């Protein structure tokens, strides 16, 4: 199964980006959850503005769908500067990055999503740009080639990644501010989905918001997607209002259970329980058993299952916990 086909995927699906932009918070005062990140960024931004400096470079990492792009937009808005957006895979050549850097205004924010996917050649260009606000470029070819230095205006690089461990040490060490985004609490997601419903002109009761929030895997992007699908159900099968009962019926129909698990989550858990006696099972064997790539299991399926205590990683492999057995009503054999 392709990850983007899953309703509870944290990846961006189809035209969601334009909808997300419309309901995205613009300022830190509107930003819900991540209290430590919010408090720290308030201080760092205010201090930079008081000094008249560009904000230090920021690395934001964590699972997909938690608001890394949203936070980058908020930082630029709070600093009162332009935001230039790109991604690691798009910057194929050094010239691609050089063109973006030379078009920055003083204190602008350059946001690079999936920064762990930068090519080594492009990454080398970033080092002097981040450290000294200088751009080293080669003019000409062969024996006549020469290096020239261009001064850049002070700017802020914001890098976002789901795989901070894949960043090289020289790049990681050049970020003065490092923020990890955690899965959201249900209460925060209730606040987020209520705000989104208001922006979309939907009637959502507190009970409806709770049902959506608790099945959203701690991820705002999933919360907002479920809201749109439950809206469809409410308009066709009810009077358009989303209360607790309507939300439960809609989410059950969509095959999203009370823990926010879908078919793939249940398939993984049952594979560990049934095919491997609860584990431990190695990642390659587990990937073969459910027909998924190991990277998909590591980056997409496992993080939430581990965070919720349904799977444990051990030196010998993955183990299904008592929570997993209880979820399926299976008695664990000792």
From Swiss-Prot:
Keywords: ATP-binding, Cytoplasm, DNA damage, DNA recombination, DNA repair, DNA-binding, Hydrolase, Nucleotide-binding. Its EC number is 3.6.4.-. It comes from Yersinia pestis. GO terms for biological process: DNA recombination; DNA repair. DNA binds at residues 294, 313, 318. Belongs to the RuvB family. This is Holliday junction branch migration complex subunit RuvB. The RuvA-RuvB-RuvC complex processes Holliday junction (HJ) DNA during genetic recombination and DNA repair, while the RuvA-RuvB complex plays an important role in the rescue of blocked DNA replication forks via replication fork reversal (RFR). RuvA specifically binds to HJ cruciform DNA, conferring on it an open structure. The RuvB hexamer acts as an ATP-dependent pump, pulling dsDNA into and through the RuvAB complex. RuvB forms 2 homohexamers on either side of HJ DNA bound by 1 or 2 RuvA tetramers; 4 subunits per hexamer contact DNA at a time. NCBIfam families: PRK00080.1, ruvB. Has 3 domains, the large (RuvB-L) and small ATPase (RuvB-S) domains and the C-terminal head (RuvB-H) domain. The head domain binds DNA, while the ATPase domains jointly bind ATP, ADP or are empty depending on the state of the subunit in the translocation cycle. During a single DNA translocation step the structure of each domain remains the same, but their relative positions change. The keyword tRNA-binding does not apply. GO terms for cellular component: cytoplasm; Holliday junction resolvase complex. ATP binds at residues 23-24, 65, 68-70, 131-133, 174, 184, 221.
């Amino acid at each position: 199964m392709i990850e983007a086909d899953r309703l509870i995927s944290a990846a961006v699906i189809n035209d969601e980006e334009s909808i997300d932009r419309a309901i995205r918070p613009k300022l830190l005062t509107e930003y819900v959850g991540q209290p430590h990140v919010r408090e720290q960024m308030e201080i760092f931004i205010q201090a930079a503005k008081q000094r008249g400096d560009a904000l230090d470079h920021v690395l934001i990492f964590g699972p997909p769908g938690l608001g890394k792009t949203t936070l980058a937009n908020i930082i630029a808005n709070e600093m009162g500067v332009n935001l230039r957006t790109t991604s690691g895979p798009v910057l194929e050549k050094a010239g691609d990055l050089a063109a973006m850097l030379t078009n920055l205004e003083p204190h602008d924010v350059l946001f690079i999503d999936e920064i762990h996917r930068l090519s080594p050649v492009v990454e080398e260009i970033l080092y002097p740009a981040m450290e000294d606000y200088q751009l080293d470029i080669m003019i000409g070819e062969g024996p006549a080639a020469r290096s020239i230095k261009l001064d850049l205006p002070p700017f802020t690089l914001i890098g976002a990644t789901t795989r901070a461990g894949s960043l090289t040490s020289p790049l990681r060490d050049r970020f003065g501010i490092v923020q990890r985004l955690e899965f959201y609490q249900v209460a925060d997601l209730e606040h987020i989905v209520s705000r989104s419903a208001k922006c979309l002109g939907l009637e959502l009761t507190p009970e409806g918001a709770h049902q959506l929030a608790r099945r959203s895997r701690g991820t705002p992007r999933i919360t907002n997607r479920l809201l749109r699908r439950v809206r469809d159900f409410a308009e066709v099968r009810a009077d358009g209002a989303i209360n607790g009962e309507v939300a439960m019926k809609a989410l059950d129909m969509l095959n999203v259970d009370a823990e926010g698990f879908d078919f793939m989550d249940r398939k993984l858990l049952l594979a560990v329980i049934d095919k491997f006696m609860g584990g431990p099972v190695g990642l390659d064997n587990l990937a073969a058993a459910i027909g998924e790539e190991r990277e998909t299991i590591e980056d997409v399926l496992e993080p939430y299952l581990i965070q919720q205590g349904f799977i444990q990683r051990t030196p010998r492999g993955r183990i299904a916990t008592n929570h997993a057995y209880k979820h399926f009503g299976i008695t664990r054999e000792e």
